[in-house]
């Protein structure tokens, strides 16, 4: 969807302006860090410090009669998580590996897919991830957009964190947890959220509307084609 592509570009441009080029903070005093010069009051952390849960997904037992969905790596693309290629499965039990809104998912196996990052905008309670994906769940609303946008901005770096031989590469969970990340001060995050949240929620609304229309299409199209319904009935 072109509108969503434009919103994604705006969001990433905003992140880069604030946290790569430091445009809103150029009048502040800077200090040396492992990330180069950063504003005073900011500091270095590792990703695990900003998250409540980082884990690979589960091994699914596929079942087309189930209402539970499982996401594979083809569901993470273009910076978002999509349900287009989700499959149905029968879980043994519910776990933290069920996707929550604002989770960030990272493809974690295979050359060409590993390192691809997407944000889960949808708000559903029946979607899990398979073992080829790592879920990154920020621990608070204060950092959730920052963490997601930070990882989206570092997809090539994440790809290069892979281990293993060609064709059998994977991204170890511990490497994700220990990923160095710059942590802005609280005031900067609050100001950033005030701008990024309206964009994020518009993306959420657009994705939900697209999903709703797709479901409606899937229900109506077979009935129209069979003659059970006509255009006049709609």
Predicted features by range, described:
Residues 1-58, 178, 182, 186-232:
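Non-catalytic DNA-recognition/assembly elements of restriction-modification systems
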Residues 27-29, 60-67, 161-163:
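Short coil/turn segments at secondary-structure boundaries
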Residues 40, 45, 66, 100, ...:
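Structured loop/turn residues at beta-strand edges in well-structured enzyme cores
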Residues 72, 94-156, 162-167, 172-176:
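A short beta-sheet element
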